[in-house]
A protein has these predicted regions:
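Short acidic, glycine/serine/threonine-rich loops at helix termini
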Residues: 1, 13-17, 177-178, 227, ...
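Structural motif
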Residues: 1, 162-164, 194, 236-237
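Catalytic alpha/large subunits of respiratory electron-transfer oxidoreductases
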Residues: 1-10, 50, 108, 117-119, ...
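Flexible glycine/proline-rich, aromatic-decorated loop/lid segments
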Residues: 1-26
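Pocket-edge structural micro-motifs
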Residues: 5, 44, 122-124, 131, ...
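A conserved amphipathic helix/loop scaffold
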Residues: 30
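Long, contiguous, secondary-structure-rich segments that constitute the structural scaffold
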Residues: 33, 39-90, 175, 182-196, ...
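Long, low-complexity segments enriched in small/aliphatic residues
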Residues: 66-183
């Protein structure tokens, strides 16, 4: 089931981060488009269907919840950040600037200064190199202490023509958001996500700068616009994630590396992504490729 949710431009919200000195009033710019609804309204409707609307919403609407969250944070922050304006003043002004501490925050500094009084939230209260808790799970892919385990795919076990794909976060958008925007499009004038390869690897494959290439493995394939470099490691290709999927059979014409990466977790415990454990082959694209 897919329910259309509003974008940040279609709802009111508060923007903040634990390391920023500004708290921003994110005011709705336009009414929700089509049948889109605020996430809160969607879940409130679902809660009503199962008879727990009152427990979920606590008799507050969108703005009442923003006010409650702000005032709660304001009360807690007053001890460290000084006097902070009330919600009405904050919302009218559009932002609040808090006082920055005289010394920068250093992670675990309190613990290092007073390890007995400032214990960490671990069973021992200390930094644990070995975890009895994790070890007790009996997971063969995540034991109780750090250890190197051979990746499913890596250059140490690659065929001669295979390359290791790094699909990092893009520098011109957040994940895949606004991939259709001018800033993102400017990075791919041919409409295809760039892929960077060491110039020696490109020469060995008869490939040239600006050429449209096909990256592929047993899981799928995508196109990329080749960019050569002498600073990337030989045997490695780099293609940022975030291109919107543009499928043509098992091929993504836009250059989405998710068509190539493994859909597996790091371990039974963590279940993090292993997108960087990915081997591909790269060759010239033959025939029509334009989107």
């Amino acid at each position: 089931i897919i329910l259309p949710a509003t974008t940040p431009l279609e709802r009111n919200d508060i923007g903040a981060s634990s390391r920023d000195r500004f708290v921003m009033a994110m005011k709705k710019a336009v009414a929700p488009q089509g049948e889109a609804r605020h996430d809160f309204d969607i879940f409130r409707g679902l809660a009503k269907r199962v008879g727990v609307e009152r427990e979920f919403a606590m008799e507050r609407n969108e703005m009442e919840w923003l006010r409650t969250l702000y005032e709660t944070a304001r009360q807690r922050a007053s001890e460290e950040a000084g006097e902070i304006p009330d919600f009405d003043t904050f919302w009218a002004n559009g932002y609040v600037e808090t006082d920055m501490p005289e010394t920068p925050y250093i992670v675990y500094s309190e613990y290092r200064s007073d390890p007995d009084g400032e214990k960490l939230p671990t069973p021992s209260g200390k930094l644990e190199i070995f975890s009895e808790t994790i070890d007790s799970f009996g997971y063969d892919d995540c034991i109780g202490h750090p250890v190197w385990m051979e990746p499913v795919e890596w250059l140490g076990d690659a065929a001669p023509e295979q390359l290791h794909l790094i699909s990092n976060q893009p520098g011109n958008k957040l994940h895949s958001q606004l991939d259709h925007g001018a800033v993102s499009r400017a990075n791919r004038p041919k409409g295809v996500e760039p892929v960077t390869m060491h110039i020696d690897d490109a020469c060995a494959r008869g490939l040239k700068e600006g050429q449209i290439v096909r990256l592929h493995n047993a899981r799928g394939a995508c196109l990329g616009e080749l960019r050569t470099s002498d600073t990337i490691r030989p045997g490695v290709v780099q293609m940022s994630t975030g291109a919107w999927l543009d499928p043509d059979g098992d091929l993504c014409r836009g250059g989405n590396p998710n068509t190539l990466t493994l859909d597996k977790g790091t371990s039974r415990l963590a279940q993090g992504p292993i997108a960087h454990s990915c081997l591909v082959r790269v060759q010239a694209r033959s025939g029509s490729w334009r989107r």
